[in-house]
Every structure is written in C-alpha cells, then in structure tokens.
Amino acid sequence: MSLLERLNQDMKLYMKNREKDKLTVVRMVKASLQNEAIKLKKDSLTEDEELTVLSRELKQRKDSLQEFSNANRLDLVDKVQKELDILEVYLPEQLSEEELRTIVNETIAEVGASSKADMGKVMGAIMPKVKGKADGSLINKLVSSQLS
C-alpha cells in the first residue's frame, strides 16, 4: 500500500472518529504530496519521492519545535510535538544508532575517508543508503566523530 493510499484510509478513519488533530496533519501531508507531484509534473510519486516529502515535513516540524521551545511557547511546542508523533507513524522503521554506526564505518572504509575534509564524500555516499531510515543530523554527528 502506497503512502497516499494509507493517508486516504487514515483520513477516513479520523473523520469517522472525529480526531481533528490527526486529520489536520494527514491533510497537510497529503497536500504536500500532491503539490510535489504537481511540481514534478507527475500523476503519482514514487515511494522514494513520497519519503522525501515526508522527511521534509518532519524536518520542518522539528525546526519549528526547536524555535518554539527557544521562544518558550509551550502551547505551540505541545501542538508541534503531537504533529511529529502523528507523522512518525508513516515513516519506515528507523535504524538504531548501532546499525547506523556500522553503516558509517563501512561507508568510511568504502570511500577511503581519513579526515574531516572527506566528510562531504562520506555523507554523499551514506545518505542514499539510509534515506528515510535515519535522521541526517545524527548521521552527520556520527560521521564527524568517526573522522576526528
């Protein structure tokens, strides 16, 4: 089942159960997916493209969460945290830090990286492997710790 089909199914369920918050988030994600399809001039998106849109939505929410907590807006922090929890249901299972560390070490060996100057090469090689399954900032932190 594609992400769009799953969103449609959940949207119906949330309408029936009158779960307004979840319904709003699902509608926003669905709109983002449709906008991306229009932008790419396609009828439907590939699974990879859907994952990219979902990751972008998550990243926006995480950035907002950080900004709201810095501004001490607890009401908005709660709202955005709930949205994040709803969105994370649609992501594929995330890799553990140990699995990521293994992938990082393998990729560093493949690329032959030895210093922080090679970080771009490593990140470029590793991101397609873990797309949607890991947070980019965590990968960045692991790579930089291995290269230092």
Curated annotation (Swiss-Prot):
Source superkingdom: Bacteria
Gene Ontology terms for molecular function: carbon-nitrogen ligase activity, with glutamine as amido-N-donor
InterPro entries documented for this protein: Asn/Gln_tRNA_amidoTrase-B-like, GatB_Yqey_C_2, YqeY/Aim41, YqeY/Aim41_N
Q: Which residues form a coiled coil?
A: none
Protein name per UniProt: Uncharacterized protein YqeY
User: What gene is behind this protein?
Assistant: yqeY
